[in-house]
Amino acid sequence: MDPMESSSEQDIVEESQKLVDSLDKLRVSAASSSSNFKKKPIIIIVVGMAGSGKTSFLHRLVCHTFDSKSHGYVVNLDPAVMSLPFGANIDIRDTVKYKEVMKQYNLGPNGGILTSLNLFATKFDEVVSVIEKRADQLDYVLVDTPGQIEIFTWSASGAIITEAFASTFPTVVTYVVDTPRSSSPITFMSNMLYACSILYKTRLPLVLAFNKTDVADHKFALEWMEDFEVFQAAIQSDNSYTATLANSLSLSLYEFYRNIRSVGVSAISGAGMDGFFKAIEASAEEYMETYKADLDMRKADKERLEEERKKHEMEKLRKDMESSQGGTVVLNTGLKDRDATEKMMLEEDDEDFQVEDEEDSDDAIDEDDEDDETKHYYL
Ligand SMILES: Nc1nc2c(ncn2[C@@H]2O[C@H](COP(=O)(O)OP(=O)(O)OP(=O)(O)O)[C@@H](O)[C@H]2O)c(=O)[nH]1
């Protein structure tokens, strides 16, 4: 059954291969779209631990943009969410049926969400072009992500989606923290380490949104971030191994704390929204000054490496041709049916010049139902 259409049965291996190919293609198109870069809208990707209040927070952002007469666009990337308190302009659930994916691929809930996101990522260039068409009328694009944070932050599709956004618009990641639950220094440290890893993985500006401030003030967190001695004093009474580790990490994270923006918000009461949008605007400016330049540099590096690789391959091919002195070179890697290969070479002898690369060669062999891997260079 095609999970994108929920129709007839198909081969799972074939589907997976197609998926990998599409992801590769998308990676290339994301990398090459820098020429279309737009300064507006700002993409706000909302991530956070399960239950931290991402969806409620996004709902609050939608209400705030509406009230302040700015134009928002909402993208939902959580295929497993039952109902959303806001209307999403683009919803993964309209394209991928999460339960069908679970059934077809015989997966559990997390595998189902991950595969749904992978399938959706293969179409993400279309999502970006829809937003590009409306770019002039939009101020913000608000992106909700799956409840299980790692499904988005540590998956290939999450990286592809983030990269596709970041190469076309200024993009800011918002990490939602459950403030009441982070009042324990060890939980706080786990959250900060996660936020830090997201910052280094995405290489995008990050805003820490301490949510649920209607229940617990986030002042303690700001104090811990500003002065590691206050944090160490809070953890002093705990002699466990985790506490000692958190203690030493507080020093290491000092640089991270200095470079990110933190705001206290409440998705329920709406407190802190102005401060949050100020942090987003400042981060978007920072994106243009620092992150965009870095992104362009990384892209140029990637292109240079690809160019070098091509040159190296051509040089290798030229040397092979020279050493064969006009004859036929057969690169044999585990040949089983020698006669069949010789026959194949003779049949194709008419060609003036023909080079089969490794991929083509593999295809041909697959088609003929042979498992030999043979490369021929005809001169
Ligand atoms: N008091 C209070 N509760 C909140 C706030 N934000 C969210 N909640 C509650 O926290 C719970 C989880 O909120 P969600 O918005 O579903 O959190 P989520 O991160 O989207 O959850 P998953 O996507 O399922 O992981 C709900 O019961 C919300 O009502 C807040 O600012 N204050």
Swiss-Prot record:
Which tissue types show expression of this protein?
Expressed in individual cells of roots, leaves and flowers.
> According to its UniProt record, where is this protein located?
Cytoplasm; Nucleus; Cytoplasm, Cytoskeleton, Spindle; Cytoplasm, Cytoskeleton, Phragmoplast
Q: Acidic residues composition bias: which ranges?
A: 347-372
Residues binding GTP are G51, S52, G53, K54, T55, S56, N211, K212, T213, D214, A267
**Could you tell me where the Basic and acidic residues compositional bias lies?**
303-322, 335-346
Q: SUPFAM superfamilies annotated for this entry? A: P-loop containing nucleoside triphosphate hydrolases (SSF52540)
What's one GO MF term for it? GTP binding
Query: What's one GO-annotated cellular component?
Result: spindle
Give the modified residues of type N-acetylmethionine: M1
Q: Does the keyword Lyase apply?
A: no
List keywords of the entry alphabetically.
Answer: Acetylation, Coiled coil, Cytoplasm, Cytoskeleton, GTP-binding, Hydrolase, Nucleotide-binding, Nucleus
Q: What is its main location?
A: cytoplasm
Q: What class of enzyme is it?
A: hydrolase
Q: Where is this site: Stabilizes the phosphate intermediate?
A: N110
Q: What's the Enzyme Commission number for this chain?
A: 3.6.5.-
Q: What does the entry give for GO biological process?
A: cell division; embryo development ending in seed dormancy
Q: Where does this protein have coiled-coil stretches?
A: 288-322
Q: State the phenotype upon gene disruption.
A: Embryonic lethality due to embryo development arrest at the octant stage.
Per the Swiss-Prot or TrEMBL annotation, the motif Gly-Pro-Asn (GPN)-loop is positioned at 108-110
Q: How does it assemble?
A: Heterodimer with QQT1.
Similarity-based family? Belongs to the GPN-loop GTPase family.
Task of the protein:
Small GTPase that is essential for the correct formation of the tangential divisions in early embryos. Associates with microtubule during mitosis and may function in the positioning of the division plane. May participate in the patterning of the early embryo at the octant-dermatogen transition.
Name of protein: GPN-loop GTPase QQT2
Native organism is Arabidopsis thaliana (Mouse-ear cress)
